[in-house]
Amino acid sequence: KKHFLNVEEILSSSGYVDYIMPQLYFGFKNQVKPFKETLDTWNSLIKANNIKLIPALAFYKIGREDVYAKSGSNEWIEDDNIISRQIEYSRTKSKYDGFSLFRYDYIFNTSENEKINNEVKSLRKLLNLDTK
């Protein structure tokens, strides 16, 4: 037995959900699902005034190849501050109400990966946290 829900209906009516947290684990250069366009789509699907958009972002991809991104597969290796730029862009959306990061251990474990360390510094600055 399969169950489906009508996302457009749920996001158009009050009483179903308070927020939606789509897993936007895509970079800006992802050939299949570019981050900006995908976030814009989710934001535009929300018609009810009380429903908030909280994008889930892929911290774990920093410094790694994304084979599913096709021509954008090396973005997470070559580009800097992707997560910080995604948060900045997300903040421009009318339904934005925060973000989540996946995975905890990639953020808070001491890392030898310079890209991860640079992203953490960028995030701390963006979020006005102590920049030790």
Where are these regions (language model features)?
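Charged helix-capping and loop-helix junction motifs
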Residues: 2-5, 35-39, 82
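Substrate-binding cleft of secreted/luminal carbohydrate-active enzymes
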Residues: 8-31, 48-132
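Surface-exposed amphipathic alpha-helices with a cationic face
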Residues: 40-49
